[in-house]
Protein backbone atom coordinates (compact mmCIF):
# COMPACT_ATOMS: atom_id res chain seq x y z
CA UNK A 1 0.00 0.00 0.00
CA UNK A 2 2.81 2.38 0.90
CA UNK A 3 4.50 1.65 -2.43
CA UNK A 4 1.30 2.55 -4.27
CA UNK A 5 1.02 5.86 -2.42
CA UNK A 6 4.63 6.66 -3.18
CA UNK A 7 4.01 5.92 -6.86
CA UNK A 8 1.01 8.26 -6.93
CA UNK A 9 3.02 11.01 -5.21
CA UNK A 10 5.86 10.56 -7.71
CA UNK A 11 3.38 10.88 -10.57
CA UNK A 12 1.80 13.99 -9.07
CA UNK A 13 5.21 15.55 -8.47
CA UNK A 14 3.71 17.93 -5.93
CA UNK A 15 2.03 15.43 -3.61
CA UNK A 16 5.06 15.34 -1.32
CA UNK A 17 3.30 17.23 1.51
CA UNK A 18 0.07 15.39 0.79
CA UNK A 19 1.80 12.03 1.13
CA UNK A 20 3.21 13.05 4.50
CA UNK A 21 -0.27 13.93 5.70
CA UNK A 22 -1.66 10.61 4.46
CA UNK A 23 1.15 8.72 6.18
CA UNK A 24 0.48 10.60 9.41
CA UNK A 25 -3.22 9.77 9.23
Curated annotation (Swiss-Prot):
Stretches the record annotates as Disordered: 1-25
The protein, known as: Unknown protein 7
Amino acid sequence: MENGKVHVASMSGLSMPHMNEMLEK
